[in-house]
Amino acid sequence: MKKTLISIAVSITAMLPALSHAELTSEQQQQLEGIHQLLSDNPEIIADLHANLQQYVENQQQLTKAKQQSETWLNDTTIHSVTGNPDGSTVIINFTDYNCPYCKRLDNVLAKMAGKNADLKVINIYVPLKQQVIDGLETNSAAFAIKVWQNAPEKFAEVNRLLVAKPGLHDKTSIEAVAKKTGTEEYLTGDTAINESLVKNYKTFVALGLRGTPAIFIGDEVIPGFIPYDKLEEIVKKHQAEQKS
């Protein structure tokens, strides 16, 4: 029971940073009064709640710092591939892995949305958690895709589509088949700079507090895991409306 009360209080109090920048609505005022009443009725949770809130504040500060430090890196499209409009003003940062089934589902959602929204720019940050090395190749699916993007961007969309289309893990046969079909065999070679960029992607992923793929950032919102098209469409429309206001 004590843990439940602490969890509730932390969840409500987590809204405080946002509330500090705006006039309180009647609902928000009621929620704040609820916090006070909760603590008054259950004083035994105050010490634990205080510790939890301190940890929450520290985590938020670390996340803010990590976002600021990684902003230039995450938006560098000379390194990271783009789905949609490279000049779009609505930007989604997509942490993804070609060997992750939920990532592939989300990549299809993002591609569909980019096809219907001319101002949408999806920057793909590859984090190959499931497979760093493929037997018999000098590369892997992420490194191959990046090399195509950097050297033959006109071929990237089809390479990406085929990499996403394969169920399960990629292997030497599947990667070579994609390369042959798209005329990109020359990009199956290893590349030290690209490998280093993948390492930096992973370090950024961890610094941002992410623990799995897929995960997307849109504005200040972080969405972990798969999200269906209709839900993502609502978020994108809301973000675009805020951009215009």
Q: Which positions does each model-derived feature cover?
A:
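C-terminal cap of thioredoxin/glutaredoxin-like
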Residues: 23-28, 33-37, 178-245
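Extracytoplasmic/secreted proteins, especially bacterial periplasmic and envelope-associated proteins
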Residues: 30, 34, 41-48, 105, ...
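The canonical Cys-X-X-Cys-His
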Residues: 100-106, 216-217
